[in-house]
Swiss-Prot record:
It comes from Nitrosospira multiformis (strain ATCC 25196 / NCIMB 11849 / C 71). Gene3D superfamilies: Fe(II) trafficking protein YggX. GO terms for biological process: cellular response to oxidative stress. It holds the Pfam family Iron_traffic. One of its GO terms (cellular component) is cytosol. Keywords: Iron. This is Probable Fe(2+)-trafficking protein. Belongs to the Fe(2+)-trafficking protein family. GO terms for molecular function: iron ion binding.
């Protein structure tokens, strides 16, 4: 296991990312506070948002929306769930 971080999303000490996954200050905060496991959770959530909202990633508005959701997912009150989303029962 490489470097560890106290993961802000999962609330425990876990393996950290190998490099900042996003540019700028937000990428630095993610690198310092988010585990690989939590980042994988964001990738799944981001994929759901892109698919459900048919986001075009070449559109600046779509990229801005995803950046806002990324910040909310880790450092805010949580990212938005698509309209009508019902999580699978466990």
């Amino acid at each position: 296991m490489g470097r560890t971080v106290n993961c802000i999303k999962l609330g425990r000490e876990l393996e950290g990312l190998d490099f900042p996954p996003y540019p700028g200050e937000l990428g630095k905060r993610i690198f310092e506070n988010v585990s690989k496991e939590a980042w994988a959770g964001w990738i799944r959530h981001q994929t759901m948002l892109v698919n459900e909202y048919h986001l075009n990633l070449s559109d600046i508005k779509a990229r801005k929306y995803l950046a806002e959701q990324l910040d909310a997912y880790f450092f805010g009150s949580g990212a938005e769930q698509p309209r009508g989303y019902v999580p699978l029962a466990k």
